């Protein structure tokens, strides 16, 4: 494409010549890969020539109603009613009645869960970087666990044998029921 004296029918662009050859580099770049139709130029403008592939017969279809949507629509009013009922009960009840930290024995069984979350699978680079931190943390934890062990070993709650530290080898959790009615009954029978 030469610039000398030609009038371009397409959109105007700045021509830059290299070594006086008169080749419009920007025009060539815009026309590249076009196959003579305008190339990227047509895609840059919103009101460019419509692409024949985009004008294929697309139809709007109706999607069936989701049963999940019906369930949500019935659940939300029930939730709103329950919230309103709870607000009224909270206004009428004495202060502290709905405090979740106050548990009475009359309320029934209470499940206390102490959960520790930590990442099990770490990448090698993270393990190498955190190995120093882990050694410092483990020394601090061991000193803390010894202090706790001295104070609680008489009660039999936490010992070196039953303490579970993150990144241990066995990887299995231990569930222990504390202060259950069955264990209280056993203790009473043993004391008799």
From Swiss-Prot:
Gene Ontology MF terms: box C/D methylation guide snoRNP complex binding
Pfam families referenced in this protein's UniProt entry, alphabetically: NOPCHAP1
Keywords from the named record: Chaperone, Nucleus, Phosphoprotein
Annotated localization: Nucleus
Predominant location: nucleus
Origin: domain of life: Eukaryota
Record's keyword annotation contains Phosphoprotein: yes
Acidic residues bias spans: 129-152
GO terms (BP aspect): box C/D snoRNP assembly
Xref: InterPro entries: NOPCHAP1
Species this chain originates from: Bos taurus
Functional note: Client-loading PAQosome/R2TP complex cofactor that selects NOP58 to promote box C/D small nucleolar ribonucleoprotein (snoRNP) assembly. Acts as a bridge between NOP58 and the R2TP complex via RUVBL1:RUVBL2.
Name of the protein in question: NOP protein chaperone 1
The gene coding this protein: NOPCHAP1
């Amino acid at each position: 494409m030469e610039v000398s004296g030609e009038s371009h029918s397409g959109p105007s662009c700045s021509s830059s010549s290299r070594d006086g050859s008169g080749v419009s580099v920007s025009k060539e770049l815009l026309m590249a890969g076009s196959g003579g139709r305008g190339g990227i130029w047509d895609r840059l403008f919103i009101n460019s020539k419509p692409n024949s592939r985009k004008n294929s017969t697309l139809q709007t279809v109706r999607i069936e109603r989701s049963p999940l949507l019906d369930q949500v629509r019935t659940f939300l009013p029930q939730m709103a009613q329950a919230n309103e009922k709870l607000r009224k009960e909270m206004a009428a009840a004495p202060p502290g009645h709905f405090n979740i930290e106050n548990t009475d024995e009359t309320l029934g069984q209470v499940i206390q869960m102490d959960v520790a979350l930590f990442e099990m699978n770490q990448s090698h680079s993270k393990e190498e970087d955190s190995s120093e931190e882990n050694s410092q943390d483990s020394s601090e934890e061991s000193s803390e666990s010894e202090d706790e062990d001295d104070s609680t070993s008489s009660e039999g709650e936490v010992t070196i044998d039953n303490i579970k530290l993150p990144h241990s080898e066995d990887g299995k959790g231990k569930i222990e029921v504390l202060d259950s009615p069955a264990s209280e009954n056993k203790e009473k029978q043993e004391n008799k």
